[in-house]
């Protein structure tokens, strides 16, 4: 009988973390009734690391130049799944300097949270674990395993071994992010086009 491979779920991630610290796997993850304190701790670690990693900002959870309208009272209420919410081109346009205050966007230049019209934003989103790309999932699991080994087992040798795995998965995650983002050191912004010099084209006459 062959084993079918699939991307990670919260259950498989928790089991991977449990396995890394020498604990038995579980068959289901009942989030409304986690009676085992160790399982609850491991799941909490997974959720914390998921937020921490996404807070770093990756190609998969960042979007630029998103148009948003204020509500009827002129406020931009920040949704709970927004990790970062900043005005587009803020590096060049210093007429606005926005921060989160009382759950809404606040302009430190004009000293108000009331806006008169549409603005464009750069947004970093918070996704559920199962909506995260596999390469980033594996990094989250490895990083969570290190934290679990530190908090639950307190075995320094195990922590060091797991840190090696964390470094490998981080390298894979960064490689994935670079390939998906098509990043360039020239710093060309989104919605622009640039074709670099390609030597083979000199042969096309």
Regions found by a protein language model. Name each.
Residues 1-205:
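Glycine-enriched, solvent-exposed interface loops adjoining structured elements
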């Amino acid at each position: 009988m062959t084993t079918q491979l699939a991307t990670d779920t919260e259950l498989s991630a928790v089991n991977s973390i449990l396995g890394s610290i020498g604990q038995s796997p579980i068959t289901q993850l009942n989030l409304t009734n986690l009676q085992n304190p160790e399982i609850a701790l491991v799941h909490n670690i997974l959720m914390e690391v998921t937020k921490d990693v996404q807070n770093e900002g990756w190609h998969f959870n960042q979007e630029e130049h998103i148009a948003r309208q204020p509500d009827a009272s002129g406020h931009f209420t920040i949704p709970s799944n927004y990790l970062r919410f900043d005005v587009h081109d803020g590096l060049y346009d210093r007429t606005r300097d926005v921060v989160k205050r009382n759950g809404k966007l606040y302009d430190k230049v004009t000293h108000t949270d009331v806006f008169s019209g549409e603005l464009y934003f750069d947004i970093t989103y918070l996704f559920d674990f199962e909506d995260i790309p596999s390469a980033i999932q594996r990094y989250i699991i490895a990083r969570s395993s290190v934290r679990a080994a530190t908090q639950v087992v307190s075995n320094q040798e195990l922590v060091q071994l797991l840190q090696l795995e964390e470094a490998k998965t981080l390298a894979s995650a960064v490689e994935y992010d670079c390939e998906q983002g098509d990043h360039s050191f020239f710093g060309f912004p989104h919605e622009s086009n640039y074709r670099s010099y390609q030597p083979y084209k000199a042969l096309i006459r």
